[in-house]
């Protein structure tokens, strides 16, 4: 995802990968150039053999729509010629905005190699390099992004049991990364893929372009991420930690269960204000059909102080993820069931207003396994006019944006 614009002194800047030395004064031989500065939080070594032969010698690109596109990268489906196996080829420009970004691509490759034994992280097959690009040949996830289910009609969207299973997998993957000092920093529905759509497959975590290595002795501050999912400490330019990912998982869980983006405002400034002031609601209609345990799970993560958030390991032990079935419908759901039974018995129930605005904006599916990607956002639910009744009719408007380089307003940096 596009990094939010960084203050001049913060974060890591792309480093040069080569340089030209100058002869030392009074020395008899050429002077070796100093090593390039290492960006903080980035891995610099990979095990993969970087192939330089033409990519088309080994793979055929599939015709049709791209799997995803961003400012500096594009993902296309391809077929390995000698096996017929499907892969996703991620073409990444090495030079962006006049800067050499090869080091950041190397870091992404290194993180994928570090996580190669984890079933919930996308698998890296091999790497190619040309004069202008690096090409990552990745496992193909045929089910696409979980974002598509998040914005689907509620009848077709995730059920709570689905989210329980997928969230266990997400947390197992994130716990694996955290125990290896990797913080993802861009966890969102567009960066969680499915191995199949029907039947619902398993998850694959993708896009490590913003990820960083965090050692206990180091402190890292950077302004980056997708506006709706960034943690409060990102906005206040406080140190990043593993808890920064856990905030994003809280937002992700909220979105998967309800189809609503909890902090989304009318513009980015309002979104940032909602996050910094913790303006969120658990009273939406969608919560009526969720277990109390699910709501409690979200509450353990959407906590302003990073040190008070549940860790990935603690989340995996939460009752919502350890119980075998959904056993805690809310009081309002119980009331709705009582009304349904009363209706079957011939008793009157409050009339439900069915006048809903069903306009939705359809956009092409974008598989955002990219360093820099188009960010789609989930619009807040807009309720229709309601009378005095137990249930309200809801319509959804999903808002889609193509942000440029994000900049957090100055009043949020303090």
UniProtKB/Swiss-Prot annotation:
Belongs to the protein kinase superfamily. CAMK Ser/Thr protein kinase family. DAP kinase subfamily. GO terms for biological process: apoptotic process; intracellular signal transduction; positive regulation of apoptotic process; positive regulation of fibroblast apoptotic process; protein phosphorylation; regulation of reactive oxygen species metabolic process. It comes from Homo sapiens (Human). The active site is at 186 (proton acceptor). This is Serine/threonine-protein kinase 17A. InterPro entries: DRAK1_STKc (IPR042704), Kinase-like_dom_sf (IPR011009), Prot_kinase_dom (IPR000719), Protein_kinase_ATP_BS (IPR017441), Ser/Thr_kinase_AS (IPR008271). SUPFAM superfamilies: Protein kinase-like (PK-like) (SSF56112). Induction: Directly regulated by p53/TP53: induced following cisplatin treatment in a p53/TP53-dependent manner. p53/TP53 activates expression by directly binding to its regulatory regions. It is found in: Nucleus. It is an enzyme of class 2 (transferase). Its EC number is 2.7.11.1. The modification Phosphoserine is found at residues 9, 13, 28. SMART domains: S_TKc (SM00220). Inhibited by thiazolidinedione-type compounds: inhibited by furan- and pyridone- thiazolidinediones. Gene3D superfamilies: Phosphorylase Kinase, domain 1, Transferase(Phosphotransferase) domain 1. It catalyses: L-seryl-[protein] + ATP = O-phospho-L-seryl-[protein] + ADP + H(+); L-threonyl-[protein] + ATP = O-phospho-L-threonyl-[protein] + ADP + H(+). Signal peptide: none annotated. The keyword Glycoprotein does not apply. Residues 61-321 form the Protein kinase domain. The lineage of its organism: Eukaryota, Metazoa, Chordata, Craniata, Vertebrata.
